[in-house]
Amino acid sequence: NPQHAVLKGSKIIKGTWEKYKDDIMQIRTGQEISPYAQLYIDGIEMVLARYPNYDSTISHYNGYAADAIDPARVKHWKNPEGAIVHAMHRGEWGGFHYIVEDSNKKGKVTLSGGHQNNRPSPMHEEYRMVENVFEELDAPGEWYFDSSKSILYVYPYENMVLTNALVEYTALNHLIEIKGSSDDAISDINLKGLRFQHTNRTFMETYEPLLRSDWMIYRGAAVFLENTEDCNIMDCEFTNLGGNAIFASGYNRNLNIEGNHIYNCGASAVCFVGLPDAVRSPSYNYHEFIDFKEIDTTKGPKTRDYPVKCKVNNNLIHNIGLVEKQTAGVQISMAMNITVSHNSIYDVPRAGINISEGTWGGHIIEYNDVFNTVLASSDHGAFNSWGRDRFWHPDRKTMDQITKDNPMMPYLDAIQTTIIRNNRMRCDHGWDIDLDDGSSNYHLYNNLCLNGGIKLREGFYRTVENNIMLNNGFHPHVWFQNSGDVFIKNIVMTDHKDIRLQGWGKEVDYNLFPNMAALEQAKNNGTDEHSAF
């Protein structure tokens, strides 16, 4: 929109271009360009020199190679220090990012980083990419900055003329911060009709765990809000951002995010993340737990430092997570009563919408079109959630006993029911709707699932009714003996894909199957007495 006022976090490079060698050009900048910066020439994003070369048709890192940091390759780099390594989690549960600190004579590198994922693992053996290496400056569109000489090298695209071109590099992590104080919230700030672009990649900043979910997150974005009330972000464009686009941190009330176009971003589009101080008896890793005798059994949050009654409505979100892979179109953690409605979310590496834990529920996810999801990862959902709340324990036998003795404990954190209704969902490498570890107190109805079906894993009190699952069906995984789950009046296209159940919940019945064999198998499990095909 030519009417948009533009807010950029970039600086301009001016000078005279000279030939370096072959097709590579150079310019003396007199300015420092961070390896976490993004470079644009006449508005075209350039590619930091990398191996393997950039290929837009490849989902994982736009090109990957098992030998990205093999000693045989590293030995040919004059100065490996400062190279950036990106690698997927071995289970493809997001990714990691590292910096090469040093290398020995044999080409073995020493790395720092890898702190961006709350489920640590070795690097994926195949899905790896390395960048910021001068010797890998070998393809059109690539660039490299030599900080020791203050020289920028560019291998221009075909027909790209550098003389008099506008050369910009990002220099900021945030563009606007709206921050009140804990005792004096800032209110009634409206951002409308603005274009936000050009921020740094933030994957090596400080990350924090989102309780026991798989996520670590950088608490920052192009637009960052904290301690706000009744603010609006409307009809804006967010593009060419290295990290998150919008981040509501801690206390936020009645924030409205509506009618925005968010695309070409390195991390997540919209994040609602409360402060962990608001959580009772928090744990911060999958394997971490608090002894039951020491758990605070008071229901609900401890403070008010979390987002409440915020809306994400009628936004177009696509092509995000271009750098970081544990990302989402809308991310919710330690928040309550968030409404996500009428959004189109697609072309994302992981979930379109993610809820990290049960704290504190009451969300409404409705009328969203979420597709082309989990494109560069695995074992996830177009909608994904976890629920490793106070009742949850990494040892299943211990958790069985805790929940048997305290059947209402899942409601301590998931104090309100989260509703998922009237959505169209499609997942490429997982489930269309994935209520994973511990997700509790959900009501799913009137959803159209196009590819991956619906999965419910080891949680409590989920009701799933009147949904259509095309090309797939129902996936109940490792249910508790008395989970209280209900699965009724749904249309499925396969038999039930149960795994290690201790029981079949409160009710599984009145469903429509594709054929007699699938129905008979369900009846043999003691379910679907009144179902048909």
Regions found by a protein language model. Name each.
Residues 9, 41, 87, 102-103, ...:
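Hydrophobic side chains in beta-strands
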Residues 134, 158, 173-179, 397, ...:
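Extended interaction regions within the primary functional domain
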Residues 44, 55, 509-510, 514-533:
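Aromatic- and carboxylate-lined catalytic core of secreted/periplasmic carbohydrate-active enzymes
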Residues 1-227, 232-239, 278-302, 533:
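Extracellular polysaccharide-degrading/modifying enzymes targeting complex plant/algal/animal polysaccharides
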Residues 187-198, 229-243, 252-267, 276-298, ...:
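Right-handed parallel beta-helix
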Residues 14, 168-170, 330, 398-401, ...:
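Short intrinsically disordered coil segments
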Residues 5-10, 88, 174-183, 203-204, ...:
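Glycine-rich beta-solenoid repeat tracts in large extracellular/virion proteins
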Residues 119, 280, 393, 521-522:
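Glycine/Thr-rich phosphate-binding loops of Rossmann-like dinucleotide-binding domains
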